From Swiss-Prot:
The reaction(s) this protein catalyses: Hydrolyzes single-stranded DNA or mismatched double-stranded DNA and polynucleotides, releasing free uracil
Protein name: Uracil-DNA glycosylase
One Pfam family linked to the record: UDG
UniProt-listed SUPFAM superfamilies: Uracil-DNA glycosylase-like (SSF52141)
């Protein structure tokens, strides 16, 4: 089901909610007090900037942003050009090599080209303190991103949700399996990838589903912006 509505249309009311204003206020206060928060302020909402609501075909849920210097830029699992792909992304590339004919692992980990094709790379928590995983987990971000998932569920149809790990899979409760296609696997992190992420075939199954429903499949080879122009 296509929708002409934009993120701005469907999230305007949510962004006026007291909890959301408090979340932004808390994050801004930390930045102003000298605490390093990732990603930079201008990048916090990049997932929505690069993948408009009406273009969403696939959702990949992450947890919170990378907390190392220069990594996070607002797209789950993605890192800026020039930053080495982190272990979870390396394992995603390994699964792509095993399941997508012709996939060649790139030296970078910048996934904007996925986002531009309709893959919403959504972390459930949108900020983190430097070096402190899950440090912003209780700030209210999950209330906001749960709303985002429910809006996709409501306004789109036939979206493929890739839910990796128990945290992401809990979000399956928000998604109507009769309207959308839900694929679950262990998380691609080195701690769990060998428990069933490797061999899950999710990238190939996603493209198979999209093609069966008249959608263009995803080109899973990440391309840097200069290469795609």
């Amino acid at each position: 089901m296509a929708t002409e509505l934009t993120w701005h249309d469907v999230l305007a009311d949510e962004k006026q909610q007291p909890y959301f204003i408090n979340t932004l206020h808390t994050v801004a206060g930390e930045r102003q007090s000298g605490i390093t928060v990732y990603p930079p302020q201008k990048d916090v909402f990049n997932a929505f900037r690069f993948t408009e609501l009406g273009d969403v075909k696939v959702v990949i849920l992450g947890q919170d942003p990378y907390h190392g210097p220069g990594q996070a830029h607002g797209l789950a699992f993605s890192v800026r050009p020039g930053i080495a792909p982190p272990p979870s992304l390396v394992n995603m590339y390994k699964e792509l090599e095993a399941s997508i004919p012709g996939f060649v692992r790139p030296p970078h980990g910048y996934l904007e080209s996925w986002a531009r094709q309709g893959v919403l790379l959504l972390n459930t928590v949108l900020t983190v303190r430097a070096g402190q995983a899950h440090s912003h987990a209780s700030l209210g971000w999950e209330t906001f991103t749960d709303k985002v998932i429910s809006l996709i569920n409501q306004y789109r149809e036939g979206v493929v949700f890739l839910l990796w790990g128990s945290h992401a899979q809990k979000k399956g409760a928000i998604i109507d399996p009769l309207r959308h296609h839900i694929l679950k696997a262990p998380h691609p992190s080195p701690l769990s990838a060998h428990r069933g992420f490797f061999g899950c075939n999710h990238f190939a199954l996603t493209n198979q589903w999209l093609e069966q429903h008249g959608e263009k499949p995803i080109d899973w080879t990440p391309v840097l912006p200069a290469e795609s122009e």
